[in-house]
């Protein structure tokens, strides 16, 4: 079934310029809808870790992009929270039974789009989770945090207030941004452009990471890009240019996570009861 979906999506992608809500075939519509449903339920993921390597399923990302070609804008929501969009909200039509079955908590006015997966014991404070994102068990998405399209958020992660996790749709990115299990992302930090923050890492407040951001390891003096090693404690910093005329922003790995760090950043089970 998945192979059939992939084949249909790949073929539709090659013809994407000619797709519209009027002209798309039933086969293409069904394939895209089936894929979005799979994302919404967590049966499909844009990226998954296999044998310690993140594998990106580009065809699923293409299905997300194609979905915007297949729908017109429509009025949705009610009362003061009305929207005019092509993608319905995830919780539209939910009653108490559906929320209890999901096992998560959604604080107004948090919004998740259909096609985003929210696992059990997740808490969504007033935040935004975009289509294709995957938010795993026990994670807190704090106030005004944004989880971008197709971003992958691991288990027991804390995304602090105002954090931005970049998406893949605009500007178009090859790979999603990934925050692995048990990470703490400090307030107003931004992680974008497919950067991977490996498990058990801590980003201090105001850390900005893109593919072009230098990640300087204080212990080794080495500079890397695009990936924060497991168990790192990262703070914002700067590095001087070769001629000493100026400095540029960087991220500095100041140490490895220890018991003291964990005590400061541990999740509060009372909030997830």
From Swiss-Prot:
Catalytic activity: (S)-2,3,4,5-tetrahydrodipicolinate + succinyl-CoA + H2O = (S)-2-succinylamino-6-oxoheptanedioate + CoA
Keywords: Acyltransferase, Amino-acid biosynthesis, Cytoplasm, Diaminopimelate biosynthesis, Lysine biosynthesis, Repeat, Transferase
Main location: cytoplasm
Entry GO terms, CC: cytoplasm
Disulfide bonds: none
Gene3D superfamilies: Hexapeptide repeat proteins, Tetrahydrodipicolinate-N-succinyltransferase, N-terminal domain
Binding site for substrate: 105, 142
The enzyme's E.C. designation: 2.3.1.117
GO molecular function, one term: nucleotidyltransferase activity
SUPFAM superfamilies xref list: Trimeric LpxA-like enzymes
Example GO BP: diaminopimelate biosynthetic process
Domain of life, per lineage: Bacteria
Family: Belongs to the transferase hexapeptide repeat family.
Name the record gives this protein: 2,3,4,5-tetrahydropyridine-2,6-dicarboxylate N-succinyltransferase
């Amino acid at each position: 079934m998945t192979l059939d979906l992939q084949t249909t999506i790949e073929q539709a992608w090659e013809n994407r310029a000619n797709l519209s809500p009027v002209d798309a075939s039933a086969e293409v519509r069904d394939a895209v809808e089936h894929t979005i449903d799979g994302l919404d339920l967590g049966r499909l993921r844009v990226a998954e870790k296999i044998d310690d390597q993140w594998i990106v399923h580009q065809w699923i990302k293409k299905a997300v992009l194609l979905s915007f070609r297949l729908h017109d804008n429509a009025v949705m929501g009610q009362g003061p929270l009305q929207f005019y969009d092509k993608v319905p909200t995830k919780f539209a039509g939910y009653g108490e039974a559906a929320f209890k079955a999901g096992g998560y908590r959604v604080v107004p006015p948090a919004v998740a789009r259909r096609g985003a997966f929210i696992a059990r014991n997740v808490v969504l404070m007033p935040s935004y989770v975009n289509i294709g994102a995957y938010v795993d068990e026990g994670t807190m998405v704090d106030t005004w945090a944004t989880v971008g399209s197709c971003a992958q958020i691991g288990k027991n992660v804390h995304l602090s207030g105002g954090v931005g996790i970049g998406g893949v749709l605009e500007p178009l990115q090859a790979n999603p941004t990934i925050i692995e299990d048990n990470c703490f992302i400090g307030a107003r930090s931004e992680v974008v452009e497919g950067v991977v923050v490996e498990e058990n890492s801590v980003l201090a407040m105001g850390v900005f990471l893109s593919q072009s951001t230098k990640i300087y390891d204080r212990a080794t003096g080495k500079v890397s890009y695009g990936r924060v090693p497991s168990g790192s404690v990262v703070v914002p910093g700067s590095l001087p240019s070769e001629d000493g005329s100026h400095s540029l922003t960087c991220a500095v790995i100041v140490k490895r996570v220890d018991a003291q760090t964990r005590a400061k950043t541990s999740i509060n089970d009372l909030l997830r009861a």
